[in-house]
C-alpha cells in the first residue's frame, strides 16, 4: 500500500527519496522568493510595498534554502541513500527515527510559511537579532512561529545526526577501519558531529528569545540586565558551523564525482582529505565572532578571530588542490557531473577568496552588511553547495531511479545556470565595494546598473531551474532505462545495479581487506 510505504517507511532508500523530493519542492519555493527579491531590486523605487514585507521575503528565502533545501537534500537525501550502500550496512541504525527526522520537516516548513503569512511577518533576517526580533519591534505571532519552526527543524537534524553517527561508526563490516570508508561517508560524519554540537546552542538562544518575547524575561534586554550581544554570540556559535554543515557534504560528493570522471580509482590524498575535513570541522567552532566585528570588540579579540578565520583557508586549500591533483593525468570523461564539479572548484575558490578579504576585521568594518558579504556567501552557497548538489544528483540519478538523464540537455542546462548565477552575483561585489547595504528594498540611482544586471541574471537562473524540471520529467521515458553499470568495484554503491533492490546487504557484506602499513 502506497500510504504504508511512504508515510511509515523505515527504508533508507525511500526516506532518502522523500528528502530529495521535499528538498526539490522547497528549493522551488526558495527560488520563487529569491526572484521576488531580485524583482524588487531590479530598478530604483518600490515594487512590493515597504521594507517590512521585503525583509520577510529575504528571511523566508534564507530559512527555506538553508533548512529545507540544502540540508534535506545533501544530508537527508544523498546521506540516506548513499551512506548505508557505501559502508555495506542493511539500513540506517535507527530506521524509525530516520522516518521521524523526515516527517518533522514538512510541519516545520508549514510553521515557517505561517510566520510569513500572519501579522506583518518575521522581517528580522535569518539571524533573528533582538531587539528587532523582540515583542516591541515585532509584535504578534510571526517571530514565535519562526522560532517554533526552527525548533522542529533543529530536532529533525539532531535526530538524523545521532542516526548517521551511530550508523557510520557501528554498522561498517568489522574488517573495515574508519580510514577505509569513502570520503562522502566521512563528510557526512563530520557534518553530523557539527550539527550535534552546534544546534543545542541555537535552541538555547531562540528559546531565550521566546521567553523574552512572551514571559517577560530579559536575557537580551539591557533594561533588565540582559545583553543583545549575548544573543549574537550564541547565534553565531551555531551559525558559523552551520555554513560548514552546508558545504561539507558537498566536498564529499565532489571528491567522488571528480575521481569517477577522471578515471581514478580513488581521490588524490585520501588521508589529507579526511584530516582537512576534520580540521575544517574543528576550526569552524572557533571563528564565530568574525560575524560580529562591528559590535566593538577589543583589538586583540579581533586579531585572534581574523587570524583563526584565515587558518581555515589552509585545509580548504588542501582539498581544492587535491581535487586538481585527482584530475591531473586522468582519463577525463567530459560528462555533465564533471562540468558541475569543475564549476564548483573554481567558483567555490572565488567565494573563498572574498571570504579571506572579509576575514580582515579592519576591512570588514567597512564591508559588513554590504552586498560584498551577500556576494561572498552566495558564491560559496549558490555556486558551491548548489553546484555540488547538481553534480551529485546527475551522477547518482541512475542509481536512485534506474533511468538516465539526457546528456546534451543537462550540459545545456549547466551552461545556462552557470551564466545565470555568475551574472546574478558577480556584480554584487561591485555594489558592496560601492557601499550598498544589505536588507534594504530601495537604493540610490547610482546603484541601478549593477542591480539591473543582477536581476537579469536571476531570470536566467530561473530558466535553468525550469529546464532542470523538464530534464527530470523527460528522463522517466521508457527509453532511458539503465542497462549496465561501469566500474562498480571501485564505486561500491553501484554494486547492486540500477536501481538497487529494496533491501541491500540483507546478510553482512563479505569484506577482504588488504592490510597496508603506514
Curated annotation (Swiss-Prot):
Its EC number is 7.1.1.9. It is a multi-pass membrane protein. Cu cation binds at residues 240, 290-291. GO terms for cellular component: mitochondrial inner membrane; respiratory chain complex IV. Gene3D superfamilies: Cytochrome c oxidase-like, subunit I domain. The keyword Heme applies. O2 binds at residue 244. Residues 1-11, 87-94, 171-182, 262-269, 328-335, 401-406, 479-518 are mitochondrial matrix. GO terms for biological process: electron transport coupled proton transport; mitochondrial electron transport, cytochrome c to oxygen. Keywords: Calcium, Copper, Electron transport, Heme, Iron, Magnesium, Membrane, Metal-binding, Mitochondrion, Mitochondrion inner membrane, Respiratory chain, Sodium, Translocase, Transmembrane, Transmembrane helix, Transport. Residues 41-50, 118-140, 213-227, 287-298, 358-370, 434-446 are mitochondrial intermembrane. It catalyses: 4 Fe(II)-[cytochrome c] + O2 + 8 H(+)(in) = 4 Fe(III)-[cytochrome c] + 2 H2O + 4 H(+)(out). Component of the cytochrome c oxidase, the last enzyme in the mitochondrial electron transport chain which drives oxidative phosphorylation. The respiratory chain contains 3 multisubunit complexes succinate dehydrogenase (complex II, CII), ubiquinol-cytochrome c oxidoreductase (cytochrome b-c1 complex, complex III, CIII) and cytochrome c oxidase (complex IV, CIV), that cooperate to transfer electrons derived from NADH and succinate to molecular oxygen, creating an electrochemical gradient over the inner membrane that drives transmembrane transport and the ATP synthase. This is Cytochrome c oxidase subunit 1. It comes from Squalus acanthias (Spiny dogfish). The gene is MT-CO1.
Amino acid at each position: 500500500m502506497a500510504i504504508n510505504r511512504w508515510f511509515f517507511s523505515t527504508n533508507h532508500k525511500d526516506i532518502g527519496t522523500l528528502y530529495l523530493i521535499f528538498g526539490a519542492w522547497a528549493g522551488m519555493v526558495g527560488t520563487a522568493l529569491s526572484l521576488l527579491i531580485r524583482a524588487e531590486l531590479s530598478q530604483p523605487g518600490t515594487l512590493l510595498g515597504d521594507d517590512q514585507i521585503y525583509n520577510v521575503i529575504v528571511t523566508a528565502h534564507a530559512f527555506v534554502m538553508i533548512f529545507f533545501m540544502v540540508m534535506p537534500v545533501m544530508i537527508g537525501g544523498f546521506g540516506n541513500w548513499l551512506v548505508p550502500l557505501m559502508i555495506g550496512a542493511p539500513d540506517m541504525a535507527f530506521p524509525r527515527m530516520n522516518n521521524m527526522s523526515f516527517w518533522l520537516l514538512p510541519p516545520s516548513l508549514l510553521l515557517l510559511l505561517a510566520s510569513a503569512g500572519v501579522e506583518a511577518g518575521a522581517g528580522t533576517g535569518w539571524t533573528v537579532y533582538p531587539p528587532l526580533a523582540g515583542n516591541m519591534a515585532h509584535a504578534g505571532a510571526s517571530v514565535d512561529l519562526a522560532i517554533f519552526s526552527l525548533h522542529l527543524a533543529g530536532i529533525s537534524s539532531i535526530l538524523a545526526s545521532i542516526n548517521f553517527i551511530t550508523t557510520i561508526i557501528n554498522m561498517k563490516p568489522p574488517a573495515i577501519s574508519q580510514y577505509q570508508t569513502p570520503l562522502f561517508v566521512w563528510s557526512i560524519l563530520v557534518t553530523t558531529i557539527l550539527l550535534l554540537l552546534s544546534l543545542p546552542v541555537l535552541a538555547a538562544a531562540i528559546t531565550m528569545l521566546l521567553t523574552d518575547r512572551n514571559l517577560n524575561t530579559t536575557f537580551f534586554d539591557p533594561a533588565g540586565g540582559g545583553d543583545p550581544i549575548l544573543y549574537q554570540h550564541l547565534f553565531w556559535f551555531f551559525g558559523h558551523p552551520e555554513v560548514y554543515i552546508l558545504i561539507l557534504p558537498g566536498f564529499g560528493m565532489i571528491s567522488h564525482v571528480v575521481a569517477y570522471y577522471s578515471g581514478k580509482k580513488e581521490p588524490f590524498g585520501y588521508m589529507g582529505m579526511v584530516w582537512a575535513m576534520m580540521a575544517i570541522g574543528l576550526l569552524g567552532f572557533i571563528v564565530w565572532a568574525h560575524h560580529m566585528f562591528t559590535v566593538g570588540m577589543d583589538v586583540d579579540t579581533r586579531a585572534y578571530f581574523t587570524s583563526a578565520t584565515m587558518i581555515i583557508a589552509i585545509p580548504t586549500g588542501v582539498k581544492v588542490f587535491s581535487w586538481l591533483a585527482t584530475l591531473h593525468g586522468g582519463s577525463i570523461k567530459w560528462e555533465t557531473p564533471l562540468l558541475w564539479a569543475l564549476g564548483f572548484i573554481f567558483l567555490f575558490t572565488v567565494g573563498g577568496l572574498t571570504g579571506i578579504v572579509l576575514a580582515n576585521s579592519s576591512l570588514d568594518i567597512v564591508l559588513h552588511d554590504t552586498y560584498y558579504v551577500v556576494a561572498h556567501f552566495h558564491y560559496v552557497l549558490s555556486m558551491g553547495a548548489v553546484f555540488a548538489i547538481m553534480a551529485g544528483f546527475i551522477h547518482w540519478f541512475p542509481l536512485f531511479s534506474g533511468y538516465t538523464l539526457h546528456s546534451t540537455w543537462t550540459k545545456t542546462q549547466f551552461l545556462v545556470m552557470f551564466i545565470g548565477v555568475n551574472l546574478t552575483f558577480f556584480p554584487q561585489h561591485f555594489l558592496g565595494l560601492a557601499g550598498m547595504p544589505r536588507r534594504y528594498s530601495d537604493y540610490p540611482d547610482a546603484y541601478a546598473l549593477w542591480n539591473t544586471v543582477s536581476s537579469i541574471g536571476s531570470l536566467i537562473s530561473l530558466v535553468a531551474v525550469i529546464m532542470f524540471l523538464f530534464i527530470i520529467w523527460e528522463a522517466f521515458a521508457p527509453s532511458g532505462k539503465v542497462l549496465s553499470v561501469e566500474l562498480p568495484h571501485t564505486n561500491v554503491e553501484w554494486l547492486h545495479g540500477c536501481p538497487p533492490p529494496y533491501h541491500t546487504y540483507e546478510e553482512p557484506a563479505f569484506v577482504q581487506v588488504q592490510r597496508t602499513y603506514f
